[in-house]
Amino acid sequence: MIISKNRKLVVGLEIGTTKVVTLVGEVLTNGKIKIIGIGICQSNGIDKGRINNLDAVISCIRESIHQAEIMANCQITSVYLSLSSKYINCQNEIGIVPISEDEVTKEDIENVIHTAKSVKILNEHHILHVIPQEYSIDQQSGIKNPIGLSGTRMQVRVHLITCHQNMAKNIIKAVEKCDIKVDQVIFSGLASSKAVLTEDECKLGVCMIDIGGGTIDLITYIDGSIQDSQVIPYAGNIVTKDISYAFSTSYSDSEKIKIKYGSAIKLSPGTSKNIDLSSKYGNFQKNLQQDTVIEVIESRYNELLHLINNRILYVQKKLYKEGRKYQLTGGIVLTGGASTISFLTECAEKIFQKKIRIAKPLNISGLTDNVTEPHYSTVVGLLHYGKEFYFDDTNQKREISFIEKWFQKISNWFKKEF
């Protein structure tokens, strides 16, 4: 957090496939976040979380941060950084320990979570998040906060989110070369869920789907706890590439066509428009029918949504075998830039057979005209996450303590290498 003229400021930085966004929020006395600065730069040098041109990424970060600093009238020294890639992995684990005294203490909780996370994870991966799902004391299960309760043995179920260490190192390196400290790296899907989901939805059971440019992030909450997280390495950009390939148009022209004429389902008969490429999108002497373009878009969106539904059904079957609750009474919540295409709600309802909501960031004030669109769910969520780190005395602080050692390892690696 940054202190500027007695203001408590938190900064989120999203380095995505399509854009680099810096968002500055002031944490008000009532705990709300007021947006006071934003910087946006078109991404260059990164694709689906992997850096392929470090200098280009650094340049984008600097430009984005500079814009936000001017608008917020502050100097940014540290950020909360989002991360999404196919190299993100998740697993649910269990830890069991005896209760040391007559009642559960914070030390008992630290011990049981340490036991739960001391498991084998993928090679070259580090634990990014350790998120408690529920505690059990002796025969009593479903406990959210066991502090002060009596018993002889405590069990915890946790959700682990891990990432490839080199992927994280490279993104952190890019930020630190801009003389900016990384307060914490946060899985993008987790950040987005903080921005768009309500407490009731999480308790009822909900799957949040953030459809970005390079990746789709999934987070599933059951009974208020995260049960599954997943990254699909295909998203909005592949739709643009399909249009480019099908109609021999440039990538930038295809993106414009997708945004202006795209739809996730076929149009009503007689409503298709003629797309004159020669006058609108360059020097092509070519016309397209909107229906033809939509066929390409609809096919790809159907494929992407079916991939997501397969994951949802897999998790449902797995939890059912474990004898655990699995209901998405809260439905499906879609967000991210690629969720704004026309008629996506209708398309998704056919595939998921559940109620669908297209979500914008919640619980913010200030420069809301700039960021209250699905495109900014992740970076707004980073601010909510950062705020909780400072003001929540329970779960968030416990989670942070478990990744401090990981950040120390990252820091030590930098010192050795550079």
From Swiss-Prot:
Subcellular location, record wording: Cell inner membrane
Major site of localization recorded for this protein: membrane
Source organism, top-level taxon: Bacteria
Membrane topology: Peripheral membrane protein
InterPro entries in UniProt: ATPase_NBD, Cell_div_FtsA, FtsA/MreB, SHS2_FtsA
GO biological process entries: FtsZ-dependent cytokinesis
Matching SMART domains: FtsA (SM00842)
UniProt keyword list: Cell cycle, Cell division, Cell inner membrane, Cell membrane, Membrane
Gene Ontology cellular component list: cell division site; cytoplasmic side of plasma membrane
Keyword Cell division: yes
Assembly, per entry: Self-interacts. Interacts with FtsZ.
UniProt function note: Cell division protein that is involved in the assembly of the Z ring. May serve as a membrane anchor for the Z ring.
NCBIfam families xrefs: ftsA (TIGR01174), PRK09472.1 (NF007009)
Protein name according to UniProt: Cell division protein FtsA
Organism field: Buchnera aphidicola subsp. Schizaphis graminum (strain Sg)
